[in-house]
UniProtKB/Swiss-Prot annotation:
SMART domains: AAA, ClpB_D2-small, zf-C4_ClpX. The keyword Zinc applies. This is ATP-dependent Clp protease ATP-binding subunit ClpX. It comes from Wolbachia pipientis wMel. The keyword Cytoplasm does not apply. ATP binds at P123, T124, G125, S126, G127, K128, T129, L130. GO terms for biological process: cell division; proteolysis involved in protein catabolic process.
Amino acid sequence: MDNNNDLHYCSFCNKAQDEVDKLITNSSDGLKVFICNECIELSHKAISQKKDRSFNSDRISDMKLLLKKPEDIKNFLSKHVVGQKHAQHVLSVAMYNHCQSMVQFHAISDIEIEKSNIMLIGPTGSGKTLLAKTLAKVSDVPFAMADATTLTEAGYVGDDVESVLSRLLQAANYDVVKAQRGIVFIDEIDKITRKSEGTSITRDVSGEGVQQALLKIMEGTVAYVPPQGGRKHPQQEFIQVDTSNILFICGGAFEGLDKIIEARKKGTSVGFGADISQSKEQKKKNALHDVQPEDLIKFGLIPEFVGRVPITAVLDELDHEDLIHVLTEPRNALIKQYKALLAFSKVNLEFSDEAISAIAKKAISYKTGARMLRAILESLLLDIMYTSGNGGFEGSTIVITKKMVELGKATVNHNNNGNVITVND
């Protein structure tokens, strides 16, 4: 009996310490609480099962993309993005596979499907950012964007890489589960390449060091994220974010990459196979579509980083016809936007076909793709929007002409009969 009094029992299952492998107690000097190894294992299983059920339930209810096929994704992209059919094709398959891998993340315990991050290569204004944003929209997931040139290693002035995840948390209204299914777009990734292929013996604040820092969150880890953006608020509590299912899309123009590709392929198109009729622009376009991981490494991305971005999509430079489509065709086409703005002031805004063509031609002269279209329209319509905003032109129709575009300013007025006339046409 005395021996029995010395026995300790599990406070949960009431088994004696000699009936279990291990009995653990709290370190408090007050009331002693004991738990055996069997109860610990049961508790762990119960928590895991509950977590898995809620995780899968969230996916079913929140991720609308799970019901979409690659064709559906591509159709959605094509409604918002002009051209870039190949890139849309690549992204639709990549996003479909990514979402399917998240479904299997808990469903299949013995198979782990690694995520495939994406690299978008294309000139300025070709639609890299728009594609990434639209992909997040069709996926119904939070989206965050960062400029790689503003990121620095820990210990240096600037934004640390965790600030990217902080923006994603904000986009998800601090819903961690939702943020962990989001999309992060890192632009200007080509600007943080190391200066040479050899290993640097000095600190590289905005190059290889940032690639190494990004690599950690891109490959999947539990990051400790400051909700307000790290270094400016060092005393705040950190939020744990698992990046395993966050899709990272990197984008860059990669000027000069075509020359690296051509150097690698040198000699393969000599003789009867050589096409000497191709223009310089066509040769560059064709070269980029043949990009290989070794070319990106030669450009200055570290091998480990390239390995974590296995999917590459090349975007072509937008030509005159493409820019006309950008102005008129997408659901949120720029001309549709400005017509809607003027409609609020009861003004009917119209553009002649020649005017639209002239706007596209002017944008091409700036060599920044579609980015200059809005600036051109803002300058062109400035006086009209000012006057209409003050009650002028109400009930009138204003037609933008080619000459207005060439002059860069559409000045209109009323004649004595109250009709709208064009002063500079």
